[in-house]
Amino acid sequence: MAEVHVIGQIIGATGFSEGSLFCKWGIHTGAAWKLLSGVREGQTQVDTPQTGDMAYWSHPIDLHFATKGLQGWPRLHLQVWSQDSFGRCQLAGYGFCHVPSSPGTHQLDCPTWRPLGSWREQLARAFVGGGPQLLHADTIYSGADRYRLHTAAGGTVHLGIGLLLRHFDRYGVEC
């Protein structure tokens, strides 16, 4: 089977109004893909920017897939959360990006968004924290129901990804 190696890191995030940020991430693939090594999801540490608005995570990603075809190419889905001084966490943004399909190193910028909710939920978020969240995480990367959401823009997550493709020509898989 053809193989894909995804090696890189979640560098950090900019543009979020919240302070102490961390990122939950996961990778979604189609049925023809098999994870040979690595973990399918993870979480960064909390970083509070001291100067500027860049939260640095430098969280490693190292995945090795085998595939029979291109359908269901890997997508990286992200959830950025903020943590207050009491340890309470609230959603700062959702985002996703496709893993590039060409070999080499790539710098990706993944914009994020969060659901707004009703005016009461927005008011409660401003004073108490929390706020609306998605019931199903697959809504992040499937556009079927996403068009009905009222959202607010979040910040941007920065990723550095290196991609290695192996045996694509041997198994007749064309990129």
From Swiss-Prot:
For this record, the Gene Ontology CC terms, alphabetical, are: centrosome; ciliary basal body; ciliary transition zone; cytoplasm; membrane; MKS complex; nucleus
Q: Which UniProt keywords apply?
A: Cell projection, Cilium, Cilium biogenesis/degradation, Cytoplasm, Cytoskeleton, Nucleus
Residue span, C2 B9-type domain:
2-118
Where on the tree of life does the source sit, at the highest rank? Eukaryota
Q: What is its main location?
A: cytoplasm
Q: Name one GO molecular function term.
A: gamma-tubulin binding
Q: Can you say where in the cell this protein is located?
A: Cytoplasm, Cytoskeleton, Cilium basal body; Cytoplasm, Cytoskeleton, Cilium axoneme; Nucleus
List, in alphabetical order, the GO biological process terms annotated in this UniProt record: cilium assembly
Oligomeric and partner information? Part of the tectonic-like complex (also named B9 complex). Interacts with TUBG1.
Q: Which PANTHER family match?
A: B9 DOMAIN-CONTAINING, B9 DOMAIN-CONTAINING PROTEIN 2
Q: What is the stated purpose of this protein?
A: Component of the tectonic-like complex, a complex localized at the transition zone of primary cilia and acting as a barrier that prevents diffusion of transmembrane proteins between the cilia and plasma membranes.
Which protein family is it in? Answer: Belongs to the B9D family.
Identification of the protein by name? B9 domain-containing protein 2
What organism is the protein native to? Rattus norvegicus (Rat)
Species classification:
Eukaryota, Metazoa, Chordata, Craniata, Vertebrata
Gene this protein is translated from: B9d2
